[in-house]
Structures are given as structure tokens and as C-alpha cells.
């Protein structure tokens, strides 16, 4: 299972993958992310060209981010290009407006998604949605990380 995460700050965002470390300079993308409300926003990246985020994006920001994902998938792809979305929220990821918009675009392009946040601690919960699987990672300061992978394609 390829799973990675990196926190987004005003400087570089670091993401680790199974066999690759990706260094993203978040300042390059600050023109379409509302940095004032990006607390808790995550960017993920891995060696087969998957990258995603959820944050408070405007409609223009969603369009720019969609183009950004396409470009990075082209640049990083050493296998079949795929999208990835990661969310950090106390609510279901598909209920986030920006994420829902991106998912809707991807569904029109033939991608399939399923699942939602289940259980977990309200302090911190992460959901990674892939085109062919769903990984649910729940963690809190008091418990170990529990991961559940659901293949549905």
C-alpha cells in the first residue's frame, strides 16, 4: 500500500512515499490556496504520480488545482497516472465543497469513488481516496494509527 502525507505550511510541504521523498514548495501554489484558512490542509504525493489535497478553495482555485494535478501526474508518472484526494475533517470528505467539485469532475472523466469517514477520533482523522481504493487512517495522541484499505474496483 502506498500511503503518504505531508503538512502544508507557509514554506515547503514534505511528503514521504514508499520509495520516494517529494519536496513541494507550497509557496508556488499559494495563488490558488487560501493560506489563511489552510490549517489542517494536507498535500500528498507518491511515486506513481498521485497527489491531492482538500482545503478552502475558491471555484477559480479548484480549476487551477485540477490543472495542477494533471500536470504533476504527467511529470511524475512512472506508471498509470492517477488522482488522489486527501481530507482532514470532522465531517465526511465528500461533503467538503471543494473536494466534492473535484470528485464530480473526476467521475465525469470515468473515475470511480466510494466510501466516507467512519469512526475515528475527532481530534485527527485522515481519509485518502484513490481511483481504485479507499484508505481510512484514524489516529489520535492516545491511540495507534489504524488503517483500513477497501478495494472496490
Residue ranges and their predicted role:
Residues 1-153:
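Active-site microenvironment for binding and transforming phosphate-containing groups
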Amino acid at each position: 500500500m502506498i500511503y503518504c502525507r505531508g503538512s502544508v505550511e507557509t514554506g515547503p510541504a514534505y511528503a514521504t512515499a514508499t520509495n520516494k521523498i517529494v519536496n513541494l514548495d507550497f509557496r508556488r501554489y499559494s495563488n490558488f490556496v487560501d493560506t489563511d484558512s489552510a490549517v489542517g490542509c494536507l498535500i500528498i504525493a507518491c511515486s506513481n504520480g498521485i497527489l491531492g489535497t482538500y482545503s478552502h478553495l475558491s471555484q477559480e482555485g479548484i480549476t487551477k488545482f485540477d490543472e495542477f494535478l494533471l500536470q504533476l501526474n504527467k511529470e511524475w508518472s512512472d506508471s498509470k497516472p492517477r488522482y488522489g484526494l486527501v481530507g482532514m475533517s470532522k465531517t465526511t470528505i465528500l461533503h467538503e465543497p471543494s473536494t466534492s467539485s473535484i470528485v464530480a469532475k473526476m467521475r465525469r472523466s470515468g473515475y470511480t469513488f466510494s466510501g466516507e469517514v467512519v469512526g475515528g477520533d475527532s481530534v485527527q482523522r485522515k481519509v485518502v481516496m484513490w481511483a481504485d481504493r479507499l484508505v481510512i487512517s484514524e489516529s489520535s495522541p492516545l491511540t495507534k494509527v489504524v488503517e483500513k484499505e477497501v478495494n472496490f474496483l
